[in-house]
Amino acid sequence: MSVVNQSFVQDVDAVLSAQWNVGTNTKADAAAGIATIGDDGDLRFLLTRVAVSGQGVLGSAAVDIPDGDYALRVDEVAFPVGAIAHRHTHTGSGWRHLVNGDLRIEAEHDTTVMHAGDSWFEPAGSPVRAVALQTSGVTRFVRCMVIPANFVGVSTFQLHDPADAALPRLQMTHRHFDHLVQVDAG
């Protein structure tokens, strides 16, 4: 799976492509853009059989595609000032792209501060904690994951420590779509 911007012009054989276009919303309570299946957006997520590289590629990594049916999910996560996504995992692997603000990502083996325009990959089942660093406005990222079909319409978010469920959860997730891909048995 790869995340690319508008300067990516290669002809690739994508299994599936999702696009996200910047909108006008700047508040945390609604999506900041519009996502659809397609390949002509401000930001694109390409599910390909081989890694892509070159101009416009913001990141590319191998993604485990579940056996049988699966879905491509595109959503946005908005962090108002003070928001923390406590250590958690997701059922699906995928790319994130920071649209606004600064976000500290505390992964299993390192900590990185992401700035608007940065992209990062999170493998399925890999614990991560995210802390919004801005003092005003909203920090927001767009995410595209490959998820098992049984998670269509269901959150993939799983707290790593159940005790964290008692902590405040200020971030808001805005799901654009789950696009089901049915695998032909023959």
Regions found by a protein language model. Give the residues of each.
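A short, N-terminal "cap"/entry segment at the start of jelly-roll beta-barrel domains
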Residues: 1-15, 33-70, 159-186
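Short acidic-glycine-tyrosine-enriched beta hairpin
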Residues: 9-43, 67, 79, 107-128
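Short, conserved beta-strand element in jelly-roll/cupin
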Residues: 14-32, 90-105, 141-148
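Ligand-binding loop in jelly-roll beta-barrel domains
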Residues: 28-57, 124-152
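Conserved hydrophobic/aromatic beta-strand scaffold that supports enzyme active sites
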Residues: 43-45, 74-76, 95, 119-121, ...
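Surface-exposed interaction/gating patches
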Residues: 62-110, 184-185
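Compact recognition or signaling/catalytic modules
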Residues: 89, 99-125, 129-159, 164-186
